[in-house]
Amino acid sequence: MEFEFIRNTLMGEYYVKCSMGHEIVGRWLQEEIGKDPTMIAQVEALIDKAFSLPSQEHTLTGTEISLMIQGDEVLVQENALSHDYDVEMESEFDFYDAESTASCGIEDFVALIEQWKDFLNI
């Protein structure tokens, strides 16, 4: 997973750009976690928990996007995708679903979080 951090010094805003197929990870980091040191600490605690109990699923439910870690796999997914919908409509939403969920290895995810902290000077 490739990513880039952008700082708008005039507006004091921070942005995350992730590679194709991982855009939702950038949205999650930017919108759900942002510059909040408490939220970043919660993510780090979840990662530590996942390393110590790899067979369990560890979840951080966000307002719109949630994080799930199990073993060495990280899944970021829009909360709307966890709702059931009609099977006939399933094919119509395939493209939307592809942009609304992404997975990566835990090592890549840890690197993303550490570099985000460094970028924000937290």
Swiss-Prot record:
Lineage, top-rank taxon, reads Bacteria
What's this protein's family per the entry? Answer: Belongs to the UPF0231 family.
This one is known as UPF0231 protein VP2494
- The species this protein belongs to is Vibrio parahaemolyticus serotype O3:K6 (strain RIMD 2210633)
The taxonomy runs: Bacteria, Pseudomonadati, Pseudomonadota, Gammaproteobacteria, Vibrionales
